[in-house]
């Protein structure tokens, strides 16, 4: 069943290669990644949670775009997993 929030902010999919791990907390899993998406020139900032993530790995994310006042456009991914490309 869809709620009003689900309809206002449907989850999008973003997948790509991790170019840089800007921040990763081993305690909470929270991470800030710079991701290269195929066919796109610029790197995207992805924030989410992952047990372990390294540059060169491929991540698949489900979330939504946010515009953070301090950090700009980011893809906030409650669902982030490392997968085989």
Question: Residues of each region from the PLM?
Answer:
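Long, highly charged, low-complexity intrinsically disordered interaction regions
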Residues: 22-85
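Short boundary/loop segments of OB/S1/cold-shock single-stranded nucleic-acid-binding domains
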Residues: 1-13
